Design a protein with these regions (language model features):
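C-terminal beta-barrel architecture of Gram-negative outer-membrane proteins
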Residues: 592, 597, 614-662, 667, ...
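Surface-exposed loop/turn segments flanking beta-strands in extracellular/periplasmic regions
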Residues: 202-220, 270-284, 329-346, 382-409, ...
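Hydrophobic h-region of N-terminal signal peptides that target proteins for export
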Residues: 10-19
């Protein structure tokens, strides 16, 4: 009997050690401490959920450093974020939609404050129709039930190993600090945090441009410094109050500032040749260019939910989003050598604030396995851009306004939307289908008596998703959704804006929004020690917005926003997570697609076609060693990608980290080696090429490799419960 009791006790211990999530939630134990690890990726009917803690290489960074590791996300050398090859996607913060530029919004969120990232590639009718490639929902950390959470990090970057012998920005600085605090007790739930990040980057640029106007061939290759000084800081506060068993209030406030100065000090070798006579002339000049941008981002929301009955819930939310954006571009052309004579100087100050308001009402009725959802949303946003261009030539002391490059543009959008969605789950089959109707009115007005533009649109956005479990751990799903990419101030502004010495940008007030239909077929397979997902998708985009080039004069190219025909994209996305033994955790994701675009440019005068295969690979290999040491190697690779008039070159960034965690999990110490290169000249480099019948331009951007960072983190989670049973993949499945 004693042996039997011992055996049963041993068996019970083994079961709680290896399958603790099978224990009932209400089991009260006081002397057992259970350890477990959540899976890196989990699934819901309409989304994949990625654990932020799996990506140690993103520590001390922001949300961009995290999401670039997801299978369908890529970030190029210019910092542009693409989801399935498109920069048009919507960012949610804890389910609250944002309207600003995704890169600007994500840069305000410290990576250490993020719990999960939800990827929704086929959003239903209950979601906004914005974002043609889907939705990314950032879930931030909160306090445990009836407990306290305190988490902080401090980072210090090492001096640069390669500053390219730059003359202006000689000492890039990198340091960061953040703190998050959460508290939950009774009916009250509070979370707050503050973060600061300074993340300069040295860089170098080499380019070549040539134009042909009549018989004159002009070439102006250039090279020189292209560095960044940048920082951002912000605070966040959210509160939830359970008034009673049926009613709850929630409020949240996010506010942050982002600042960036980009310097481009370039030596130009300008030469002209008459193709008929052979006559040539040349001269050199030095272009000193500084682009300063800053903005304050604010997101405030107030919401309530009301349980009308056991099956019916009504919720309301009111949200304000503001972005006070300012910029100043200074451009000086100096004689070379010597740099003593000013040939021309221009300044280009601008303000472009965004104010957006949103009201939502949602009704959910759930009876058994059937769920009805209906809702209404009103959106109003206004963006007023004031773009000023002044110049002075040699010998002049006063700046003169140039009306050709100066403008005021105001865009106002009124959007009324309603939706109806039905969902049903029975046995192995679950599905949802819905329809969203949207009435939009875009009003565009300009300064200087330029006629405005009024665009009313009525669009329907149908969607459906079907998921069927072939077996206990294997499911297939098929979906369709229709999405929209709206236009912004820069894309609509018909006045040319002088970006720097060799380029200007110009919009089109008649520009139409992009409309995209997305078909998807996927499979989810839960493995014994991981998971595998694969999705085949096809996108058709009507009125794709392209930024194309044409010659403005012999030394300036004009970048013009225009609708360009029809774009199609067919691809496969896959992600594998697998644990090999107790040491090795691998996460390998990738996306490969064929992009095909064809149509006409410049009012039908120039037919074009271009296509290419594009692929990206994001891989993370983690190793858990003895005494709480861990290593992680991450690789992000983006292949060459075709554009309307050229191609964007490949981009490769490997990263490595070493981490030591104390036994009580209170402290961690980490060293990071970012943009690993070791003198090979292959990391953090990208070439952009564009060509036309009478011009050619190519630019190679070389950014600082081999960045080293050291950090210390503190983590305290205090729970007022005697035992906590962490969720596992099995428990998530049952839930």
């Amino acid at each position: 009997m004693t042996k039997l009791k011992f055996f049963l006790l041993l068996l019970t211990w083994a079961m709680t050690s290896n399958a603790q999530d099978s224990l009932p939630k209400k089991l009260s134990l006081t002397e057992i401490v259970v350890k477990g690890k959540k899976p890196p990726v989990s699934f819901k009917i309409d989304r994949q959920v990625f654990r932020a803690a799996e990506y140690a290489n993103a520590a001390n960074g922001n949300a961009i450093d995290l999401i670039k590791n997801l299978p369908s996300v890529s970030v190029n050398g210019q910092g542009e974020i693409n989801l399935r090859g498109s920069a048009s996607f919507q960012v949610l913060i804890n389910g609250r939609p944002t309207q600003g530029d995704p890169a600007f919004v994500l840069a305000q969120i410290p990576a250490s404050s993020i719990e999960n990232i939800e990827m929704i590639s086929s959003p239903g009718a209950a979601f906004d129709a914005d974002g043609k490639s889907g939705v990314i929902n950032i879930i931030t950390k909160t306090a445990p039930e009836k407990g306290l959470m305190v988490q902080s990090n401090i980072m210090l970057g090492a001096p640069p190993f390669n500053d390219f012998d730059n003359q202006r920005y000689t000492s890039p600085q990198r340091h960061a600090a953040d703190i998050s605090v959460g508290y939950q007790k009774g009916k009250l739930d509070l979370s707050s945090g503050f973060n600061y990040l300074r993340n300069d980057m040295a860089g170098y640029r080499e380019g070549d441009v040539n134009t042909t106007i009549g018989n004159i061939f002009t070439s102006f290759p250039s090279n020189g410094e292209r560095s960044f000084k940048r920082y951002n800081f912000g605070g966040r506060l959210s509160a939830g109050l359970q008034l009673d068993s049926r009613n709850r209030l929630e409020a949240a406030l996010y506010s942050g500032k982002k600042y960036q100065t980009r310097v481009a000090d370039l030596l130009y070798n300008n030469s002209r040749k008459n193709m008929l006579t052979g006559a040539q002339s040349s001269f050199d000049y030095f272009n000193k260019n500084t682009a300063e941008k800053q903005g304050v981002f604010t997101l405030a929301s107030l919401g309530s939910s009301h349980q009308l009955s056991k099956a019916t819930q009504l919720s309301f939310s009111l949200q304000y989003e503001g972005a006070d954006l300012e910029s100043l571009t200074t451009n000086q052309n100096l004689s070379y050598p010597g740099l003593k004579q000013m040939i021309q100087e221009t300044i280009n100050p601008s303000t472009n604030p965004l104010h957006a308001y949103r009201f939502k009402a949602d009704l959910t009725d759930k009876k058994g396995s059937r769920t009805w959802q209906a809702g209404y949303q009103f959106r109003y946003d206004e963006q007023t851009g004031d773009f000023l261009y002044k110049y002075r030539n040699a010998g002049s002391f006063e700046f003169t306004k140039d009306p050709f490059f100066s403008s005021q543009v105001t865009v106002r959008n009124n959007i009324h939307a309603g939706y109806l969605q039905y969902g049903h789950a029975k046995g192995r089959l679950s599905y949802q289908a819905g329809l969203r109707a949207e009435q939009m009115l875009r009003n565009l007005s300009f300064s200087d008596n330029v006629p405005g533009n009024r665009l009313p649109l009525l669009n329907l956005f149908p969607s459906y998703l079907i998921r069927y479990a072939l077996a206990e751990k294997v499911a297939i799903k098929q979906s369709f959704t229709r999405r929209i990419k709206r236009t912004n101030n820069f894309e609509l502004n018909p006045f040319p804006e002088r970006e720097h010495s060799e380029t200007l940008e110009q919009g089109d007030p008649a520009l139409l929004p992009e409309l995209t239909g997305i078909w998807e077929l996927g499979v989810e397979h839960k493995l014994s020690k991981g998971s595998f997902t694969m999705s085949l998708y096809h996108q058709r985009t009507k009125n794709p917005i392209q930024r194309v080039n044409k010659v403005f004069n012999d030394t300036i190219l004009g970048r013009i926003f225009t609708n360009a025909g029809l774009a199609k994209q067919t691809g496969v996305e896959a992600n594998l997570t697998y644990r090999v033994g107790k040491v090795w955790q691998m996460i390998i994701g990738g996306n490969i697609y064929k992009y095909d675009i064809r149509g006409t440019l410049f009012n039908g005068s120039l037919p074009f076609t271009n296509n290419s295969w594009v692929y990206s690979i994001n891989a993370t290999q983690g190793f858990s060693l003895r005494e709480n040491w861990s290593l992680q190697l991450g690789i992000n690779y983006l292949s060459l990608r075709a554009t309307a008039q050229g191609e964007d070159g490949a981009f490769f960034t490997p990263n490595f980290s070493v981490k030591k965690t104390t036994k009580d999990n209170r402290w961690n110490f980490q060293a990071q080696w970012l943009f690993m290169d070791a003198g090979l000249g292959i990391s953090n480099i990208q070439r952009i090429t564009t060509r036309g019948s009478n011009f050619y331009t190519t630019t190679n951007y070389v950014y600082e490799p081999d960045q080293v960072q050291l950090s210390v983190g503190f983590n305290l989670i205090k729970k007022n419960r005697k035992i906590s049973l962490p969720q596992s993949e099995m428990a998530e499945k049952e839930f």
